[in-house]
Amino acid sequence: MPHKVSLSRLKLTDFRNYAAASLSLDGRHAVLTGDNGAGKTNLMEAVSLLSPGRGLRRAAYGDITRVGAAGGFSIFAALDGMEGEVEIGTGIEAGEETTARRLRINGTPAKTADELTDHLRLLWLIPAMDGLFTGASSDRRRFLDRLVLSLDPAHGRRASDFERAMRSRNKLLDDGRFDPSWLAGIEEQMASLGIAMALARQEMLGLLTRLTEETLESSPFPSASLQLSGFMDGQFSRPSVDLEDDYRVMLAESRYRDAGAGRTLEGPHRTDLVVHHREKAMEAARCSTGEQKALLVGLVLAHARLVGNLTGHAPILLLDEIAAHLDENRRAALFDIIDGLGGQAFMTGTDRGMFTALGDRAQFFTVADGRVFG
């Protein structure tokens, strides 16, 4: 069983609809129930900001600050983390105009948000993701990269560095500055970073596929078969140095075409995640809404198990409205799977009765009007 990473305290100040909120947690799962709009998802969002990035809503930090507050917000968490007990604080200060939040770990300013992955890994599933299989490829790419990031914390930095290099190349091409040596230097960087990104994605999908195949018969949820398309399809069994050479040549040969298009037309930023319902041999986008939700739940749970197996530490799960639209038997099976992962899960719903099958495996909180009652 993986080590259980769990929050013991969560304190919010001027966060969304909370002027101040404090939760004392005992390591069990946390179930948050209350009316729609009470602030359940806001609590989940606060926990999600204990990972790199902008959290489960990807909101601008100015939008997170409570309306009517002086400005700024803060999140404090104490947890039993991957390296022992740790305290994490993050937020922005009043009057601070920034796209980056401040972060302290045990009172010491962190150099980068990537340091958070030394202490916990977070995965989430929210209603906004229900249209993942039918929506834009950029949403699936973002989902894919969060899966990779849970196993390879350097992936996020590679992706942002690639985007930065690509923007530089696009600007040079847009300005008509076709300096061969300058472009070659940028394209070499893009090739190195881009292939590393693509290989990390491919490796994660391979690991997840093998795990899924091993647990086919025991899961109450349909299993997904996963493929990548849109960039160097079918070539990733070749040596990385050869792939980098090919992509570098591809970029050099497409300069005029990319200049005309106003963007880079080939690269890992064009990759799409193709998902099929394994048992039905059907593309996920063609499945019913209920089947798509079940596929997504199964995929996230399988990935959570993979993270626990490979890191030795169970991820914290944020599952918003997870029990809605599931019958009683499937809800009970879902809770057993979540508990069997060995980690702590935060779950929300409007009806406490939907979580009865959890019994004493969970702490129950009621959320109402920006207040939390334990």
Swiss-Prot record:
Record-level Gene Ontology MF annotations: ATP binding; ATP hydrolysis activity; single-stranded DNA binding
SMART domains xref list: AAA
UniProt entry keywords in alphabetical sequence: ATP-binding, Cytoplasm, DNA damage, DNA repair, DNA replication, DNA-binding, Nucleotide-binding, SOS response
A GO CC term attached to the entry: cytoplasm
PROSITE patterns the record matches: RECF_1 (PS00617), RECF_2 (PS00618)
InterPro entries for the chain: AAA+_ATPase, DNA-binding_RecF, DNA-binding_RecF_CS, P-loop_NTPase, RecF/RecN/SMC_N, RecF_2
Binding site for ATP: 34-41
Broad class of the protein's primary localization: cytoplasm
GO BP terms, alphabetized: DNA replication; DNA synthesis involved in DNA repair; double-strand break repair; SOS response
Protein family: Belongs to the RecF family.
HAMAP family listed in its UniProt record: RecF
Name of the protein: DNA replication and repair protein RecF
Organism: Rhizobium etli (strain ATCC 51251 / DSM 11541 / JCM 21823 / NBRC 15573 / CFN 42)
Gene label: recF
